[in-house]
Amino acid sequence: MLTVDCLFDVPRHQLKNYPNANMFVTKTAGIWVPISTADFLDAAMQVSKGLIALGVKAGDRVAVASNNRVEWNVLDIAVQQVGAILVPLYPNISESDYRFILNDAGVEICVVSNQELADKITHIRAEVPTLKYLFSFDQLPNCPHWSDIEANKGSVEQHEVEERMKAVKATDLATIIYTSGTTGNPKGVMLSHANILSTVAACIDPIPADKNSKVLSFLPVCHIYERMLHYLYMYIGCSIHFAESMDTIGDNIREVKPDVFSAVPRLIEKVFDKIMAKGEELSGIKKALFYWAVDVAEAYDVVGKSPFYKVKLGIARKLIFSKWQEALGGNVKAIASG
């Protein structure tokens, strides 16, 4: 059972129980740069103050269209702390989808990651009457930087944010996540703090990670699956490393050596197909050992196996599976897929 009621309590739980100097780690100019739990929470608090100064009220909608980056998570917590609702947007959808979602949700503030997305929102901004502010995580010549939110905080004090936080209930709406709209206009899925935290609670035990674990994040955090896992990782004190891009996942896995990462089933299928293709190229005793190990793996279950099976599994891990694990950084204990 979790000991928090709202999503913004999750990083505070980490600070109290597992303060982490490497809460989030981002590769910048070839160097992995961390942010600590304390600094993360301070950044979120300053943004919350700025949002209040901009007139954001409980229940207002703030949108974000961005790749995975620590600023996304800071904004997420900052928005929740003032009782507002985050509307995450995929960075690769059309202008017409942006227009529909921003209007449907009644978004007042939108934060994007780069010039391409700033241009998309700018093109349709006149058709979104509720949209008051547009900011960018990147420094752009024609769009205010998101640090302006904090800069506008004026005389807003921390106790004002804390009062907002106290007013938020577990059953309050935390986010509206829109479907892809492949069969019509996108549809908003309304999720409360309790909705998401119940999933976190259900997934904690199966994930073999703790405060000493490193995870790699590359699935879009705007999707509820990866976002839920971020809250889970934060709750148990993991270090979350962001992959540079989908093209660098292999390199980043070897650099970070994660204990856990999440992936979609199709990606795992591709990895499995490559492994099986390599096995088919073997001959003699090596090929026989390979397929024997595959048979052992297919009989695997987390509980209920005999001591004899555990001996076979230990041999298979030493002779065969250790090489597969090494290709995934050497420390992988689980790949979360759903």
Language-model-derived ranges and their functions:
Residues M23-I77, S94-R99, S147-G154, H193:
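Conserved AMP-binding/adenylate-forming core of the ANL superfamily
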Residues R61, N67-V87, P91-E95, N103-I109, ...:
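A short helix-loop-beta submotif of the ANL/AMP-binding
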Residues P91-H123, T199-L216, M246-V260, E326-A327:
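Conserved ATP-dependent adenylate/AMP-binding module captured primarily in the ANL superfamily
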Residues L197-K214, V221-F321, N331:
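Conserved AMP-binding/adenylation subdomain of ANL enzymes
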Residues E116-A170, I275-K323:
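ANL superfamily adenylate-forming
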Residues P34-A38, A174-V200:
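Conserved AMP-binding A3 loop
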Residues L54, I77, Q81-E150:
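Structural core segment of the AMP-binding/adenylate-forming
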Residues P19-N22, S136, S155-Y178, N185, ...:
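Conserved pre-ATP/AMP-binding loop-to-beta segment of ANL
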